[in-house]
Design a protein with these regions (language model features):
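Walker A/P-loop NTP-binding motif of AAA+ ATPase domains
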Residues: 1-205
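C-terminal alpha-helical "lid" subdomain
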Residues: 78, 162-280
Length: 280
């Protein structure tokens, strides 16, 4: 389910194989930094690595840790204590790591965030045979230098190329359109055991060449955004009343999502300009 460039896939496979065998060989785990734009597969890759390697898996979100203030210290110590007592080993994934692991010389770092960073530094100061730390961020330049010194492997998750986007389109079109999987539904305990399955969508006049052309047109979109394009195609098909996706509807969704991407980038540029004006 993780579509990556061949070189990145090969490197991740090597690291996953090493992580799976590290305890057997009696060697320490290698801590990792995953960086790149949002939606490029950092979290999914970490989860897949944990499953493949047989490690237990824990997730911390920097956006959740930072507001805890001084309570973050207690929570972090609890996570590391559990990691060091696990019989299987633990992959500790820290998403949005820059939210509380940013450089200590930054002016707006609170005492609570500094304390949380100090816990991370003290608990990761030496090589570990108990846990592997995987940090994920969109802003690696904001991370504390001492924390970066703990990292053994740095992997850049870039936006997908044309070949990867085409593979994603085919993967997601199968998942959401032509062959949707069944799933258990259990909202608040109701309807447990009932199988829910989306109706398959008929592709009307959409060829392999059309999908390849769309992959080219979707340049600059992340994997998450490509998935959302296909979900929008699903909505268009069901909205037609007959669960059919025509070539015109397919192309209209692609065109609309490209325009939406341009609008979002414009919003970011306006926000950056406003922030720069306020700080000057």
């Amino acid at each position: 389910n993780v579509v990556l460039a061949p070189t990145m896939e090969s490197r991740l496979n090597t690291l996953a194989n090493f992580t799976a065998s590290a305890r057997r060989h009696g060697v320490p785990y290698r801590h990792m930094l995953f960086y790149g734009p949002p939606g490029t597969g950092k979290t999914l890759a970490a989860r897949q690595m944990a499953r493949y390697s047989g490690l237990e898996y824990a997730v911390l979100s920097g956006g959740d840790v930072a507001p805890l203030g001084n309570d973050a210290v207690t929570q972090l110590h609890s996570v590391f204590d559990w990691s060091e007592s696990s019989s299987k080993g633990v992959l500790l994934f820290v998403d949005e790591a820059d939210a509380f692991l940013r450089r200590r010389d930054t002016a707006n770092v609170s005492e609570g965030v500094r304390a949380a960073l100090n816990v991370m530094l003290s608990r990761t100061g030496g090589a570990s045979k108990d846990f592997v730390l995987v940090l994920a961020t969109n802003r690696p330049e904001d991370l504390d230098e001492a924390l970066l010194d703990r990292v053994d492997e740095v992997l850049e998750f870039d936006l997908p190329g044309t070949a990867e986007r085409e593979e994603m389109l085919r993967l997601f079109m199968k998942r959401y359109l032509t062959d949707p999987p069944s799933s258990s539904v259990g909202i608040s305990g109701y309807f447990k055991g009932i199988k829910a399955q989306s109706d398959p969508v008929e592709l009307d006049g959409i060829s392999d060449g059309d999908i390849a052309e769309a992959a080219v047109d979707l340049n600059g979109l992340s994997g998450r955004e490509v998935e959302k394009v296909v979900i929008a195609m699903q909505a268009a098909a069901y909205g037609s009343g007959d669960a059919k996706l025509t070539l015109d509807a397919f192309r209209n969704v692609v065109k609309t999502k490209i325009q939406e991407k341009s609008s979002k980038l414009a919003f970011v540029d306006i926000g950056d300009a406003a922030g720069a004006a306020l700080s000057s």
